[in-house]
Amino acid sequence: MDEKNILSVLDSDFIVRLRMTFKDTKRVYLLTDAYLGGDLYRLLSSRGPFPDMVAKFYVACVIEAFDYMHRRGIVYRDLKPENLMLHQNGYLKLVDLGFAKKVPSGGKTYTFCGTPEYISPEIIANAGHNIASDYWALGILIYELLSRKTPFRAKDDLTVYENALKGIHGIHFSNRIGRKAESLIKALCRQLPIERLGYQKGGVNDIKKHKWYSGFDWEGFHVLALPGPILPEINDPMGDLRNAKPLRRDIDIPEETSGWDATF
């Protein structure tokens, strides 16, 4: 229900748009706009790691989406390349708000959720979290876009969590990641949430003013005036699914009779 309620009040060029909802005896459905360029993970796997110019553009899309959500007290909690879809204009759309939650100003939430390699230390420690956890994840995203790897990767989730708790300053940065980008990543991935860039007094503008973004046209970007760095090949905007993941159709779901979805 949270995903439906949150999507219904969001209206941003950088976030998926909900058009309508409906249900049957087995499923509930969220009808959204289709973004036929595929997800960023697929693009990163085939064309990454990205140069700075491309990574800056894609991260800027996330910054705009986060700024819009955070101003409304909504924490996202599931940032990863798979949840960023490429529009035909080359811009990204933030999708899958299943973990998104409205948190009162000054408050925290305690649900353990997210993708292991992107989860912040305070979520791991069950210390309570807020929008600052999204900025931690943003730092992880920058690292992955520039290197095609996540900084705390390991063979199992427990070791990933242990690595994250040790902190970003013990992580080796490859030559693919320049000093300015490294500086931004470390500023976003501070262990203490109150010290993270984006969560301090200057808010998201502190990120926009970081030296990694020197010369970036934020005003033009905000109104979608900048050309997208990679334009997906889409022959038919009504049905070209070449960039989409194939759907599983072999799952048999029993009918729902509990009535939990009465108000959906």
Describe every region a protein language model picked out:
Residues M20-T21:
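A short, aromatic-enriched beta-strand patch in the conserved N-lobe beta-sheet
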Residues K26-D39:
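Conserved short submotifs of the Hanks-type protein kinase catalytic core
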Residues Y41-F50:
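AlphaC helix of the protein kinase catalytic domain
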Residues Y58-V59:
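Activation segment signature within eukaryotic-like protein kinase domains
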Residues I194, Y199-F264:
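C-terminal regulatory tails of eukaryotic serine/threonine kinases
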